[in-house]
Amino acid sequence: MLFRILIILSIALIQKTGDNPGKRIIFTEDFEQSFLNLNHWNYELGDGCPNLCGWGNKEYQHYTKENVFVRDEKLVIKATKQGDQYFSGRITTKDKIEFQYGTVEVKAKLPKGLGVWPAIWMLGHDIDENYWPNCGEIDIMEYVGRMPGKIHTTLHTKDSYGISKNTKITTVEEIETGFHIYKMHWNESQIKFSIDDQEIYTFAPTEKTAEIWPFDKPFYLILNLAVGGYFGGFEVDDSILPQEFIIDYIKVYKDINL
């Protein structure tokens, strides 16, 4: 009986997932439930005040639970405006799903229009003690409506703070149309990014000090849709609202020999 259980567990750990055979699954989220799984996710609410008003970027939105929901087995983060106030959503896996190394794969459809700023990103699990940017940040995908057709991938570190490096802007025709797959492969030596299985950027510094490479520890996932701000732009076209950032699935996996 024990042998049988071990075989079943081994098969589960080395299960094939779509185009990723022979991978060891760390985390998967396909939003089959009609509600957000709070065993995996946390809501981040409000405007960041008093400690981080505007979420550190002078963003306009207040985050609410109501602006994050599951519809047709997909996660929807919806940006809206009511009166003079913008609302949207942000969720994280902090303290629930954290991992070191592996591949993150997210299939998502972007919102569009001046002022929207969706992102798929990660922060070091020690951010509460080792403040940003020392904790490290991995931006798997950022898009801003003021720069249509372009995807931003960036690594934020103490070494790169205030300097435009460790970043890539990739032009993708019709990126706002339909779903696309954003992927980040991370190991002890490098971080690679791809869109629809086309590699776009690799960060592989030869020197790996804490200032350059704070990526040797667990990180957690963040999904959000901001409105306005330093990067999103301070001009918002209210006529395009509401807008939705839709996530079909999330997979985190490692090679079976890791």
Predicted regions span which residues?
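A general, composition-driven signal for non-globular sequence regions
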Residues: L9-S10, Y182
